[in-house]
Amino acid sequence: MKQFIIEIIYQAEPEEIAKVRDEHRKYLQTGYEKGLILMSGPQVPQIGGLVVMKGNSMEEIHDFFANDPYNLAGLTKYLYFEFEPVMHQEFMKN
């Protein structure tokens, strides 16, 4: 599996983001259930969010976020980064 970091950048006012946040988080939960998402959360200050994922390809990650309610509502843009971890905590070995 490949490793990815996705930066979600808000392109709308906080009030608009808040209206869709619950749907967005429910959608992210499907990524957790599929074993794709390792962790996620808002940036501080809340100008967007970060998601750490694993997957087979960048295309798989793009496809996942194509259906994110934030994306479908036109509220965000996404930056995608693939990386190769060379060091990690022992508990992350597998």
Language model regions located:
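Conserved, structured core segments of small domains
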Residues: 1-94
